């Protein structure tokens, strides 16, 4: 294939194309002159070394490996978590005594949050802190409700969603109490805080940035 592509012009072709044959000496002289012009700082000996080599690499480019984009693993959606029942508390785990240590941790968390609960601590300050605090582990009681069966229910808060509290009672019964139309109390070290569920329909993570009014309607 190479012999077909590269071959010398015949005399007839050279005449028609006006191409003159250059001898080996003229070709060598041309290469030497070209190298000298291209690399003027190189010595004659170095040029001779270049000419003695079989091949001269003019340029070389390394092929950059394309970095594979790592796909970020997406977490489960809320719908998928519900379908997998990840939030469900198993019946064998629905025991009040099992969550008493959680309640003790919650009390210490609130004491640290309020810089210590002292008798002279302002109740308004505690109320403001509790409204934005994480209530998981608190003992919550229903004091008022439009549904009489909810009144008097007391237990440790295990789960909080936007619209309900899930609490475990001393009788080891898991109760789901809607926030709407209910008033709750939270007690710690003698301080009692009231939570109006109708105004408390927020997720636990959203309450930390919520500005609650000091005074508002208390209708169920």
From Swiss-Prot:
Any one GO MF annotation of this record: ribonuclease P RNA binding
Gene3D superfamilies: Ribonuclease P/MRP, subunit p29 (2.30.30.210)
One annotated Gene Ontology cellular component of this protein: nucleolus
Protein localization: Nucleus, Nucleolus
Top-rank taxon, per record: Eukaryota
Keyword tags: Nucleus, Phosphoprotein, tRNA processing
InterPro entries on file: RNase_P/MRP_Rpp29-subunit (IPR016848), RNase_P/MRP_Rpp29_sf (IPR036980), Rof/RNase_P-like (IPR023534), Rpp29/RNP1 (IPR002730)
Primary site of residence: nucleus
Modified residues (Phosphoserine): 10
Gene Ontology biological process terms in this record: rRNA processing; tRNA 5'-leader removal
Family per record: Belongs to the eukaryotic/archaeal RNase P protein component 1 family.
Function: Component of ribonuclease P, a ribonucleoprotein complex that generates mature tRNA molecules by cleaving their 5'-ends.
Known partners and oligomeric status: Component of nuclear RNase P and RNase MRP ribonucleoproteins. RNase P consists of a catalytic RNA moiety and 10 different protein chains; POP1, POP4, POP5, POP7, RPP14, RPP21, RPP25, RPP30, RPP38 and RPP40. Within the RNase P complex, POP1, POP7 and RPP25 form the 'finger' subcomplex, POP5, RPP14, RPP40 and homodimeric RPP30 form the 'palm' subcomplex, and RPP21, POP4 and RPP38 form the 'wrist' subcomplex. All subunits of the RNase P complex interact with the catalytic RNA. Several subunits of RNase P are also part of the RNase MRP complex.
PANTHER family given in the database record: RIBONUCLEASE P PROTEIN SUBUNIT P29 (PTHR13348:SF0), RIBONUCLEASE P SUBUNIT P29 (PTHR13348)
Name assigned to this protein: Ribonuclease P protein subunit p29
Species the sequence originates in: Bos taurus
Gene for this chain: POP4
């Amino acid at each position: 294939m190479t012999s077909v592509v590269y071959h010398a012009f015949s005399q007839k072709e050279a005449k028609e194309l006006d191409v003159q044959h250059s001898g080996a000496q003229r070709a060598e002289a041309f290469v030497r002159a070209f190298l000298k012009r291209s690399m003027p700082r190189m010595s004659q000996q170095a040029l001779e070394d270049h000419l003695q080599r079989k091949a001269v690499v003019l340029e070389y480019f390394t092929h950059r490996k394309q970095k594979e984009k790592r796909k970020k693993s997406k977490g489960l959606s809320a719908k998928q978590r519900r379908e997998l029942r990840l939030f469900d508390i198993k019946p064998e785990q629905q025991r009040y005594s099992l969550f008493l240590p959680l309640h003790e941790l919650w009390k210490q968390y609130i004491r640290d949050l309020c810089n210590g609960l002292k008798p002279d601590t302002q109740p308004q300050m505690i109320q403001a802190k509790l409204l934005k605090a994480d209530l998981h582990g608190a003992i919550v009681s229903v004091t008022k409700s439009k549904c009489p069966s909810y009144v008097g229910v007391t237990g440790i808060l295990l789960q909080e969603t936007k619209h309900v509290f899930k609490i475990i009672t001393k009788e080891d019964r898991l109760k789901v109490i809607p926030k709407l139309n209910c008033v709750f109390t939270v007690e710690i070290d003698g301080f009692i805080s009231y939570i109006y569920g109708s105004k408390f329909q927020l997720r636990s993570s959203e309450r930390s940035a919520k500005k609650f009014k000091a005074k508002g309607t208390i209708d169920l």
